[in-house]
Amino acid sequence: MTRTAAPPATSCRRTRRCGAVLAGLTLALAAAAFDAPAAELFQSDGWDLRWDNTLRYTAAFRLFPYSNAVVADPNADDGDRNFAPGLISDRLDLLSEFDLSNGPFGIEASGAFWYDTVYHQANSNDSPATFNPYTVPHNRFTHATEILDGQDADLLNLFAYGSLDAGDIPVSFRVGRHTLLWGESLFFANNGIGAGQAPIDAIKAASEPEAEAKELFLPVDQVSLTVQPSPDLSFAFYDQFEWRRDRLPGSGSYFSDADYLDAGGERIIVSPGEYLYRTPDNRPPASGQFGAAMHLMLGEVDYGLYALQFHAKEPQILTYYSSSGGNNDGAYWLTFPSYIQAYGASFSTYAGESTLAGEISLRTNMPLVSQGLFALPGSGGGGYGGFAYAALRPPQVSPAPALQAVLAYPTGGTLHAQLSSVSTLSPGAFWQGADLSAEIATNDLLNVTGHPELLASGRDSFAAAFRAVFEPHYYEVLPALDLSLPVGLGYDLIGKSSVDASMNNGAGDIELGISATYRTVWQGSLTYTHFIGPPDRQPFSDRDFVSISVQRTF
């Protein structure tokens, strides 16, 4: 099944100016349109112009102070120390969407703007000695983090679309910035076939653990094409001409547990007074990312086959270290592995009121969890998301083009599988309707083909994780008011993955919430998130929080 993901807000400096113009225009007109429903601005002679806006306010509160066990690593403590119990987010979001169409052809554009007051003021950091940035005082956020988490605008979708007949064969296309999600991933965005097609909003994944994969993927510039020679057979293709990295939490932000990644990351603490300073990243080429898929409907089952090549969106860390002493002992930089291949198959079908789906995929040249050639104090040889430290000693501090071909992280073949179900439950004694979604995901390390000496010790070849969301609904509780009570559970069942360092058995999270919809355009929610697991497996084990949000669509 091919899904077009709903694009979440993300920072993108290259498109900030366009997003700012769009946000400014929307804010200027929002007051006049606020009492109107979703706007169909124009319709005449086949032309249809729509403009839809969603304005949301969110406040989130930390419940408990940091744990000394969690902040023991000086390179993973700033995000924890920066926030005392109390307000951790005071944020306004605006999403604006335009669609101009004429028959089967059209142009779609969307943009986002956000502002969070928390990142524009002093924080609660109480440890200057373990504060990684050097451009700001220990109780301030770096400028890059302030922008990413505190105030930004982004152009999301901007593409032309259309459909036509090539003879008797229907053909549809999209050209421009949009998102594709192939395969059948429900929750585990990074484990599925579609993981190679787009970067992931890791901030949203951490702050909303129950979010579905389609809500986490970010758009990129590409051309995509679907050809359907018969009602039961279709082929899909895409070619990307933009590479974007995952949107990792800014250094020192609430959901950051790596002080050296990504926006705002400035240095690694080796020992008191000794540092590795960040130098420019090694970015992969914009080209070389493409894929093809086939779907065949046999009876009630949709089968899919996939092949794609992509560049990694999450980084590995390379370092240059000198033991000569002094205050500038070396450097580190982020590198993004290139030319990873994936081959997969999927199925989806219906069983009564439920959808059952699954997929399996093989990746080659896949970067693995790195052990590193040296361990920093308190790190145990690990790092944020498993982006451990692989030491490399180049002839100069700044990475030269010739060094990009040097493998300083382990790679290998991996096998990934996922099975999911989405069910609509009939009215019962305790609800008027309910939805139940669940997925299990596994990954298996088949072989190590590059730098096996760098593979992290203590990791397992096989790992499995589970996530489920149950949401009962109650209609017309008051006139025009509907309520639901979502409950989510995520838990890593087996193994410490050698493929995904965030998959550690015994770690997980629980979400308890209540959400309301009034007159279909007002929505509100209250959610409590509790993180499960010890600090060595769950870096957010002391960061339980409550969030409140209200939004209006107009």
Show where each model-derived region lies:
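Transmembrane beta-strands of outer-membrane beta-barrel proteins
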Residues: 49-57, 107-111, 171-173, 235-237, ...
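Residues that define the transmembrane beta-barrel architecture of outer-membrane proteins
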Residues: 47, 75-77, 88-94, 151-156, ...
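Transmembrane beta-strands of outer-membrane beta-barrel pores
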Residues: 57-63, 113-117, 177-181, 239-245, ...
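Short loop/turn motifs that connect adjacent beta-strands in outer-membrane beta-barrel proteins
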Residues: 37-51, 64-66, 98-107, 120, ...
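Outer-membrane beta-barrel "beta-signal"
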Residues: 521, 541-554
